[in-house]
């Protein structure tokens, strides 16, 4: 089914409009120059009904992305948080992916967006395991990309903005065309950065490591995983990680709103650890799903009911 040809509603510039009518002009500035900021958010079915995971943090990151790129989003944080709840309710969804996006309109053309209006849209739709149900259980195969992740002074890694994803698309296409499930990108110095749309963790000798975040997005799921891991008594360290550090890790996994917690069983045809989902990964994965489905009352504050 085409993303454009669906029933339902999209929140567009302050109003719920029929899905097929949520359109914009072909001369929209952001379509040509790539300057749009967006979020990926998930809602889950919980014991308190449908609830959005870490809505406040995702909305804050959207506004931070706008600030980095001098984009003044014309709504308050509170309005956009309510709009995300509203669009889930309007589409009668129990579990879904939510995509808020702010972009420049068609009021002008040219590299500078000055004079173009900022528009905001929010869509929501059902979306299961991003990297596959089997991958969640058995782990995925990953290829180190020949494309480097952006240097911090090329694009701003603290922003989740559309233009960055051209780099991600190249890496992901290269990996999937070669028969892998996902790509791992290195930074310009040759150290591990992140996946095409995920943060990376490795496990070695009972400790958890993540790459330094110079060239990687500060993931919200990543932050949740670190919190849970430390609650388990695991030491979590951010440091420069090499590709061969991943080769000889005991376990590895990706995190992200779409990817959730996805084990990595292989990198560049080299099995990671036992070549499947490791015990620490499985423990963290279970804890994560307990939290997002409302089964852990300690983290209830991370869930915002849609009603």
Specify the residue positions occupied by each region the protein language model found.
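Helix-start/capping segments and mature chain N-termini
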Residues: 1-75, 79-86, 109-307
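Short, internal active-site loops enriched in acidic
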Residues: 103-108
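Short secondary-structure junctions
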Residues: 89-96, 234
């Amino acid at each position: 089914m085409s993303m454009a040809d669906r029933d339902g509603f999209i929140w567009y510039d302050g109003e719920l409009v029929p899905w097929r009518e949520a359109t914009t002009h072909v001369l929209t500035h952001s379509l040509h120059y790539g300057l749009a900021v967006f979020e990926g958010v998930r809602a889950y079915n919980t014991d308190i009904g449908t609830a959005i995971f870490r809505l406040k943090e995702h909305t804050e990151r959207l506004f931070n992305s706008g600030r980095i790129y001098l984009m003044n989003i014309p709504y308050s944080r509170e309005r956009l948080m309510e709009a995300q709840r509203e669009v889930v309710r309007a589409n009668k969804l129990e579990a879904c992916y939510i995509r808020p996006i702010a972009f420049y309109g068609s009021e002008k053309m040219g590299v500078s967006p000055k004079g173009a209006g900022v528009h905001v849209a929010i869509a929501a739709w059902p979306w299961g395991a991003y990297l596959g149900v089997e991958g969640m259980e058995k782990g995925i195969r990953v290829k180190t990309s020949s494309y480097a992740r952006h240097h911090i002074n090329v694009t701003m890694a603290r922003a989740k903005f559309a233009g960055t994803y051209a780099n991600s698309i190249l890496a992901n296409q290269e990996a999937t065309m070669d028969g892998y499930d996902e790509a791992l990108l290195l930074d310009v110095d040759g150290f591990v950065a992140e996946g095409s749309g995920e943060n990376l963790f490795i496990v070695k000798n009972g400790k958890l490591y993540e790459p330094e975040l110079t060239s990687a997005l500060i993931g919200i799921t990543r932050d949740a995983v670190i919190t849970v891991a430390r609650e388990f008594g695991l030491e979590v360290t951010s440091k420069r990680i090499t590709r061969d550090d991943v080769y000889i890790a005991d376990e590895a996994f990706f995190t992200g709103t779409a990817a959730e917690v996805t084990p990595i069983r292989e990198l560049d045809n080299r099995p990671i650890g036992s070549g499947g989902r490791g015990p620490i990964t499985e423990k963290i994965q279970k804890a994560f799903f307990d939290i997002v489905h409302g089964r852990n009352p300690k983290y209830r504050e991370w869930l915002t009911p849609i009603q």
